[in-house]
Structure formats: structure tokens, C-alpha cells
A protein has these predicted regions:
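Generic structural concept
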Residues: 59, 100, 104-107, 170-177
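Residue-level signal for well-ordered alpha-helical segments
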Residues: 38-46, 50-53, 125-129, 133, ...
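Generic preference for hydrophobic/aromatic residues in regular secondary structure cores
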Residues: 9-15, 32-40, 116, 121-122, ...
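Short secondary-structure junctions and interdomain/linker hinges
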Residues: 6, 10, 69-72, 110-114, ...
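Amphipathic, oligomerization/interface secondary-structure segments
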Residues: 131-181
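Charged interaction/catalytic cores of defense and host-pathogen modules
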Residues: 1-101
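Helix-loop junctions and short alpha-helical segments
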Residues: 63-148
Length: 181
């Protein structure tokens, strides 16, 4: 909620002005955008539906918000009736970095260990001692091999991945290793 108050979602979702009511952002219909992106209903507004979120809903909403957060840089102060800042310039990368930092601090305390990746995907956090396996450099400069290893690793760690998804990720890694052999 604090990021919303600080204007981090103003560029995408708009903001409230005492003179003009709701000023639209880049996303005109947030509920529709969530439906098209996540393919689920009854997620927006968050304040209305959050109490009924499943774990997957919660993590999907985090990924959705990551795509739309941006740090407010410059704007004009609308002082009439305490309206506040009307942000006009934003930095998406800085906003995403701060969002990721704050979300990962929350996810650190969640019952199942997850982390928000630099790509905006919520992934299972590796168990203690296994971090090096997931962070190791791929022993190849071939972008196709690196891409396949990264995709398999992400598919294995992805929130909501089924046992079959994980099996397929292991098979994909085995195929790469066989090729490298």
C-alpha cells in the first residue's frame, strides 16, 4: 500500500485528484488487464479481494504488479485541498528494483520460501545449501544452451509448477548435459 501512496503505480494505474477525480494511467481497465494477463477473475481491486486470494493468486498478483511498478521521478505538487503530487516522469527499472526488494522482504517471512526474480517471476527459493546449484554459471558460451538451462531452472523453481513440470525441467537439463557430453 505504501508504494501506491508514494506514486509507484501512478504511471500504470493512474491516481486520484480532488479536482479531476480519477486520472487514468497507461492501463485503462486494470481488472481486464489482470484477467487477460493472469486469466483469473476477482483479483482487482486488491483491497476488496485479497482476503480470498489463494497462494497462487497472491503470487500471480505480485508478478502482475512487478510489470507495472515504476518509481516516480518528477511531477507537480497540487496543493489544493491536500491533493498531493501529480507525477509525470517515472523510472521503471528503479521502481521494479525497489518493489522486488520490498516483496522479497515480505516473502522471506512467508510459510513457503519464495523470491521475486529480476525478471519478475516468483520462484521457489532453493533450500539452504543448494543455492550454488541454481546460481552456478553454465559451462558454455552458446546462448542456446545457456537459454535452455535458464528456462529449465526457472520452470523447476516457478511457483505453481507441478510435479510433471519439474520432471520436464529435469529432462530438459539432462538433454543439455547429454549434448555437452
Amino acid at each position: 500500500r505504501q508504494l501506491e501512496i508514494d506514486g509507484y503505480f501512478s504511471e500504470a494505474f493512474g491516481f486520484w485528484c480532488v479536482d479531476a477525480d480519477h486520472i487514468e494511467g497507461n492501463v485503462k481497465d486494470i481488472e481486464l488487464e489482470m484477467l487477460l494477463t493472469i486469466r483469473k477473475k476477482n483479483l482487482w481491486p486488491i483491497s476488496e479481494y485479497a482476503s480470498s486470494y489463494t497462494e497462487d493468486d497472491f503470487l500471480d498478483v505480485i508478478e502482475f504488479l512487478y510489470q507495472y511498478v515504476s518509481k516516480p521521478i518528477d511531477g507537480t505538487m497540487h496543493s489544493y485541498n491536500g491533493c498531493g503530487m501529480h507525477w509525470e516522469t517515472f523510472n521503471k527499472k528503479d521502481g521494479q528494483n525497489l518493489f522486488r526488494e520490498k516483496i522479497n522482504a515480505v516473502l522471506e517471512h512467508y510459510k513457503n520460501k519464495f523470491e521475486l526474480s529480476q525478471n519478475g517471476e516468483v520462484l521457489h527459493k532453493p533450500e539452504e545449501g543448494f543455492e550454488q546449484i541454481f546460481n552456478a554459471d553454465v559451462p558454455s558460451k552458446d546462448s542456446n544452451i545457456v537459454g535452455r538451462v535458464d528456462a529449465a531452472t526457472t520452470n523447476f523453481r516457478r511457483h505453481g509448477s507441478s510435479l510433471d513440470d519439474r520432471r520436464q525441467a529435469v529432462r530438459d537439463l539432462a538433454d543439455v548435459l547429454e549434448y555437452l557430453r
